[in-house]
UniProtKB/Swiss-Prot annotation:
Lactone-forming carboxylesterases, specifically catalyzing intramolecular transesterification, but not hydrolysis. Involved in the biosynthesis of tulipalins, defensive chemicals that show antimicrobial activities against a broad range of strains of bacteria and fungi. Substrates are 6-tuliposide A > 6-tuliposide B. This is Tuliposide A-converting enzyme b1, amyloplastic. One of its GO terms (molecular function) is lyase activity. The gene is TCEA-B1. 6-tuliposide A and tuliposide A-converting enzyme, which are compartmentalized in the vacuoles and plastids respectively, come into contact with each other for the enzyme reaction releasing toxic tulipalin A upon cell disruption by pathogen infection or herbivore predation.
């Protein structure tokens, strides 16, 4: 059995628009596939955020607007992530393509909760030469601002396939529910459920044979990028002591009510809107779920792992928040070993789209070394 980086072409149908229209000029086209998911009520009670009208209008200005024009009126524009229309449709502009799991290269999908539909994608590296060897297990949480991406997204599928091949770890990637259809804390709850599902395999009959046969449940690590890094912190606070060996937070999506010097006003306002859309009952950007350093947030001394690494990128608008998190962790009295990896000249989650660049290769090497405990 071999591990391949690519498992074949993506499905013939790509769900969601990817035509790069930007914020305006919204037109209907028979070639565009739209998601038509009705959002929860809170997503329609928006307080005047970016209500741009659609551009489909009658050619004769004396005519009344057509139903099509009315359908395309925008309630909230969060390009390049998603657009919410006044008729209730949610259109995701990226992060919706799914690459099927590939059993022939040791990847597969498993539904862990039929009630919610939460699933995981497993990545098993080549074990032909050492069939009885138990592999450390990495539980991974993908990014996407809590509103886009999934375990089958090309960037994540290809990156985790490569990571499994190079590290020799059995990887379990959690496919959690997205906002705004499923407001936070649904995503956090789903990721915690995915983590607990993995841990449960150490306490009796194991429902998943790959984990039972090949997983070393005494060596569990967790990791996530962007929003997945936020979830990683959440899980570290709630896991049982002694269960997690190590944690890697990659460009973690931490926010705060104070705009930092490296953050533009546009970026700051965009992510505030995104967070409020995802979390209707939020306290704002100092909600401990998104700002682990906010007043009243749980102490970082309570993280349940032996070692941790925080990756930050120089050109990422989140870089200073990541640094602040690392500094606070070191000063918290936490008893583990912490490491900060700062990479220059690159931006947010650059490593998901570039595997061959020098900085990406260096990052992969550092990640593999951390996961292996080297």
């Amino acid at each position: 059995m071999s591990v391949a980086l690519f498992c074949g072409p993506p499905p013939a149908v790509s769900f969601g628009c990817k035509d790069g229209r930007g914020r305006k000029g919204m037109v209907r086209s028979k070639d565009i596939v739209r998601q038509t998911v009705k959002p929860p009520a809170h997503a329609c009670r928006l307080i005047g955020w970016n209500k741009y009208p659609g551009s489909v209008v009658p050619t004769n200005s004396s005519l009344s607007p057509s139903p099509t024009a009315l359908d395309d009126e925008i309630e909230l524009d969060l390009s390049p992530f998603l657009i919410i229309y006044k008729d209730g449709r949610i259109e995701r502009l990226k992060g919706t393509t799914v690459i099927p799991a590939c059993p022939e290269v040791a990847t597969k999908d498993v539904i862990i909760d039929p009630a919610t539909g939460v699933s995981v994608r497993l990545y098993l590296p080549n074990v032909v030469d050492l069939p009885s060897k138990k592999l450390p297990v990495l539980v991974y949480f993908h990014g996407g601002g809590f509103v886009i991406e999934n375990t089958g997204s090309p960037n994540y599928h290809n990156y985790l396939t490569l990571l499994a091949a190079k590290s020799g770890l059995l990887i379990v990637s959690v496919n959690y529910r997205l906002a705004p259809e499923h407001p936070i804390p649904a995503s956090f709850d789903d990721c915690m459920a995915g983590f607990n599902w993995v841990v449960s395999h150490s306490a009796g009959p194991a429902p998943e044979p790959w984990l039972a046969r090949h997983g070393d449940l005494t060596q569990i690590l967790i990791s996530g990028d962007s929003a997945g890094g936020t979830v990683t912190h959440y899980v570290l606070l709630r896991a049982d002591a002694g269960v997690i060996e190590g944690a890697a937070l990659v460009h973690p999506y931490f926010l705060g009510s104070k705009r930092l010097e490296n953050q533009t006003e546009e970026d700051f306002e965009f992510h505030e809107k995104l967070w409020r859309l995802s979390t209707p009952d939020t306290e704002g950007l100092d909600d401990p779920l998104i700002n682990p350093l906010a007043p009243g947030a749980p102490s970082l001394a309570g993280l349940k792992c032996k070692r941790a690494v925080v990756f930050v990128a120089e050109l990422d608008f989140l870089v200073e928040r990541g640094r602040m998190y690392y500094d606070a962790l070191v000063k918290s009295g936490w008893g583990g070993k912490a490491e900060l990896v700062h990479q220059e000249g690159v931006g947010h989650v650059f490593h998901l789209s570039d595997y061959s660049g020098d900085v990406s290769v260096d990052m992969m090497a550092k990640m593999v070394a951390f996961l292996r405990g080297e």
